[in-house]
Amino acid sequence: MRALSNLFYQRRTLTLLLILTPPLLWFGVVYVGSLLTLLSQSVLTFDDMSMSVVAELTTANFAGLLVPANLDIVLRTLGMAIAVTLGTVLIGFPMAYYMAHHASPTEKGFFFVGVMLPMWASYIVKAYAWTVLLAQGGVIYWALDALGWRGALQAVLQLPVIGGDTLATSNLGRFLVFTYIWLPFMVLPIQAAIERVPANLLLASGDLGGRPLQTFRHVLWPLAFPGVVAGSIFTFSLTLGDYIIPQLVGPSGLYIGNMVYTMQGTIGNIPMAAAFTCVPIVLITIYLAMARRLGAFNAL
């Protein structure tokens, strides 16, 4: 036993290899293997007559993604992912800044609990709870009626992009649910990035005559930007792949996740479902490459 211990001590590379081999094998089999299986299925043929997969190679599935109806699904999903990411930044950055530079230890603890609280409940429970909040007769409509703002809401809901008779059937309602659920994934990376910004830099900017907006633009934002990008990795990718919220909240119109579920679970067109699944993979890969160049991984 001592001889074996001495061997591992003297040969650190061998020790490291033995430690890393099991997780790397698991990663290779489960993750890389599943991706290769996905790619292999995306080039197979689906026979509409027999409703079965035929082992004939084709690129028709990827060409089918460019059909206007399918392209609309991709653009709809991408637009919501971008909107949710921007929304979480606008809400999360002030919260993260206060937590990092102004909150007392007790206040910071309360903020952390408040930010993390949505993650303690089941995802399905949160989504269903929002359908109740957004429905006619829900708390939000009750508050708007009390303030006399219901007419203003109805005017907003008539806008083409917002669309919907009520909040529960509008893109605005869907956006609110996405933003609420993914907000913790944006706040925490930004807060970690801002905490690394020395307070002396902000004070020095003010001493040199910099106005608050100038200090934010030229000092705080560039230094906190990697944290913003790190948080956006989560919000962007999670929105791209989600299919529960689009089913529960918002107007009719499929997202990528819904289309994959329909193609595979209802129709049985696995090759087309695999081709649709490749879309968020490609988008997220491009986004991760951009995030890495911006130094976002240092803020994770």
Residue ranges and their predicted role:
Residues 68-101:
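Transmembrane alpha-helix signature in integral membrane proteins
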Residues 16-20, 95-133, 202-203, 225-226:
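Cytoplasmic-entry segments and transmembrane alpha-helices of multi-pass inner-membrane transporters
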Residues 10-15, 49, 62-69, 246-292:
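Interhelical loop and adjacent transmembrane-helix boundary motif
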Residues 2, 7, 191-202, 206, ...:
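C-terminal transmembrane helix and the adjacent membrane-cytosol boundary/short C-terminal tail
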Residues 31-70, 137, 250-251, 263, ...:
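Short membrane-interfacial helix/loop motifs at transmembrane-helix boundaries
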Residues 5, 9, 127-179, 213, ...:
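Membrane-interfacial helix termini and adjacent extracytoplasmic/periplasmic loops
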Residues 22-31, 86, 117, 180, ...:
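Transmembrane alpha-helices
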Residues 1-40, 108-114:
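N-terminal signal-anchor/first transmembrane alpha helix
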